[in-house]
A protein has these predicted regions:
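Surface-exposed loop and turn segments in beta-propeller and other repeat-based domains
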Residues: 28, 32-40, 87-103, 162-171, ...
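Beta-strand-rich domains and repeat architectures in extracellular enzymes and scaffolds
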Residues: 35-72
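Residue-level detector of Asp-centered blade-edge/turn motifs that repeat once per structural unit
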Residues: 53-56, 113-115, 180-182, 234-237, ...
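Conserved beta-propeller blade signature
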Residues: 59-62, 118-119, 184-187, 239-242, ...
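Short, conserved, GDST-rich strand-edge loop motifs in beta-rich repeat architectures
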Residues: 64-68, 120-146, 356-380, 427-428
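Beta-propeller blade signature
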Residues: 74-82, 137-157, 197, 308-312, ...
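Loop/turn-rich, solvent-exposed surfaces of beta-rich toroidal or solenoidal domains
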Residues: 300-302, 306, 333-388
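Blade-level signature of beta-propeller repeat domains, shared across WD40, Kelch, NHL, RCC1
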Residues: 407-442
Length: 442
């Protein structure tokens, strides 16, 4: 009998041991840098996109500020020499550095390179929280209100910045892309969601108004609408696509400058769960997206559910491919805590692998009372890939800093020429939390 028990126990351990091992999350160690971001920034700063790798492999990035009097700062990083260079203060480059106005706190967009220049836009970073929502912060005594986001270029040879145009109505430019071939810049403003076009040849800005009802200044449950964070340009004909929370895909036509709806398709899918289009979050907008020239399709992710999907405008059709949340999130069966979703989403250097930085519950993290609550969910960060050719999903594991501290709140991604992945995370330094550049190798 004892022999049988020992045999049964041994067999059980042999079967379950591999399962137990496989459930232990892999760890990816990252390297953090020191950009010498200004002290005194409220909340340690933020980072939402604000990155890009130029043709020579140099990384350009912006560390954002939530303070009314400290602007976001732009830097370059040379991967060969490991040297970080401070390039500019965002308020200075648009001529507002000495105006004592609420600062240009962010660049909320990915940089686009064209004809020897980087193009991007600026945005405000100073908010007031009202009922759990971000509203433009009232200027401190003696300060002017925020003056509006700008379209900006940076000459990679001369180092000169050029202020191209300013958004009307004192709104920031939260979403940006560029038609490189035709020389047009596109943006969506915050908080009301006006669609903008700037033409490099004519140097004229056009405001098409908003399709977002009250935008993110609207009333929750009524006129509130989350604003799309990605404009996708089809290089074949210059069409620019963006979404609204109802799940509609809108198309700007380059030749006629008309905006209409893509007929016959919607991003409102049962798989994405029931989304409140007037509630806090992205609803049925795509959260992040890119155009894949291999099959001339748009690949995007639904922010709340983490489902990857493919949009074929020519058919037209929407195909749900795979939930690409982290393994811990998938196993929990729950949404990630951050209802907006994640923007660290891009096509890898091989042209067929999706790179995605996504949230994950950190188990057994102490709560504010100092005790452990197994039901409390706090976001860590996992690096996930999905091969569009083989349909293979891989969660490569949790990102941590050099000392094992979980990487927190990454909402940006850029891939170097050597395959190094860059993002921006909160980093503890000198007893404080600051925002900083980090990198890792997949």
């Amino acid at each position: 009998m004892r022999t049988l028990r020992h045999f049964t126990l041994s067999l059980l351990l042999a079967i379950t041991a591999p399962l137990l091992v496989s459930q232990q999350p892999s760890i990816i160690y990252s390297t953090s840098y020191n950009s010498h971001f200004p002290d005194g920034v409220t909340g340690g700063g933020e980072a939402w996109n604000g990155m890009g790798v130029a043709h020579d492999g140099t990384l350009y990035y912006v560390l954002s500020s939530g303070s009314p009097n400290i602007a976001g700062q732009m830097y370059s990083f040379n991967p060969k020499t490991q040297v970080i260079t401070h390039l500019a203060d965002l308020s200075d480059i648009v001529g507002e550095g000495n105006m004592k106005a609420v600062a240009q706190g962010k660049s909320h967009v990915n940089f686009v390179e064209a004809n020897g220049k980087l193009y991007f836009s600026t945005h405000l970073g100073y908010y007031n929280q009202a009922g759990g929502l971000e509203r433009a912060g009232a200027p401190p005594p003696g300060y002017l209100p925020y003056l509006g986001g700008h379209f900006v270029s940076y000459d990679l040879t001369t180092g000169k910045f050029e202020n191209l145009a300013k958004a009307p109505g004192g709104e920031g430019i939260i979403t940006f892309n560029m038609d490189v071939q035709r020389g047009r810049l596109y943006g969506i403003t915050w908080p009301t969601g006006h669609f903008l076009r700037y033409d490099l040849k004519t140097k004229k800005l056009k405001d098409f108004g908003t399709l977002f009802l009250g935008g993110e200044s609207g009333v929750i449950g009524s006129t509130y609408r989350g604003i799309c964070r990605r404009i996708i340009v089809d290089p074949r004909d210059g069409s620019a696509y963006f979404t609204t929370g109802e799940g509609t895909i809108h198309r700007y036509h380059y030749d006629t400058e008309v905006i209409d709806d893509v007929p016959g398709i919607t991003l409102k899918k049962d798989y994405f769960g029931t989304q409140d289009i007037a509630g806090h979050g992205m609803a049925y907008n795509w959260r992040a997206a890119f155009f894949n020239p291999t099959d001339n399709a748009i690949y995007a992710v639904n922010g709340r559910s983490g489902y990857l999907f493919r949009v074929d405008i020519n058919t037209p059709s929407v195909q749900v491919l795979k939930r690409i949340t982290s393994e811990p999130s998938t196993a929990s069966g729950m949404f990630d805590r951050f209802e907006y979703g994640y923007m660290g989403f891009t096509l890898g250097p091989d042209g067929h692998t999706v790179y995605y930085l996504t949230g994950a519950p950190i188990p057994s993290r102490p709560n504010t009372a100092g005790t452990t609550n197994p039901n409390r969910r706090a976001d860590g960060c996992h690096f996930v890939t999905y091969d569009l050719t083989t349909k293979k999903y891989v969660d490569h594991g949790q990102l941590v800093l050099e000392d094992g501290t979980p990487v927190a709140a990454p909402q940006s991604i850029a891939v170097g020429l050597d395959g190094t992945v860059y993002t921006i995370s909160y980093v503890p330094r000198n007893g404080k939390r600051t925002i900083e550049l980090i990198s890792f190798h997949p």
